[in-house]
UniProtKB/Swiss-Prot annotation:
PANTHER family: CYTOCHROME C OXIDASE ASSEMBLY FACTOR 3 HOMOLOG, MITOCHONDRIAL (PTHR15642:SF3), CYTOCHROME C OXIDASE ASSEMBLY FACTOR 3, MITOCHONDRIAL (PTHR15642). The gene is COA3. Disulfide bonds: none annotated. It holds the Pfam family Coa3_cc. It comes from the Eukaryota. The keyword Chloroplast does not apply. Component of 250-400 kDa complexes called cytochrome oxidase assembly intermediates or COA complexes. The lineage of its organism: Eukaryota, Fungi, Dikarya, Ascomycota, Saccharomycotina. One of its GO terms (biological process) is mitochondrial cytochrome c oxidase assembly. Residues 1-30 are mitochondrial matrix. Belongs to the COA3 family. This is Cytochrome c oxidase assembly factor 3, mitochondrial.
Amino acid sequence: MVLDPSRYQDHRTWKMTPGLIRARQPFFKKNMIGLAILAGVSAGIYTYTYSFLHKDNDFADVPIPPIDEKELEKLKKEYEQHKQERQ
């Protein structure tokens, strides 16, 4: 059977027996330190990558052309119409 009962688990509740808990105690602190290091390295890499990617500003030197007042009003009307259609 796939889930054969282990002698280190209670057969009714599947909880660890006191013997298994005692056997795992010496490794708990080292495992938590390893987990903290692994999580710290992962968070550091993620933070570095996120901050590096947000520094990118490729289009800073491209000038934005001025917009005509009539065209601006037309765009505002289109935006309002689109906003009302979504609701």
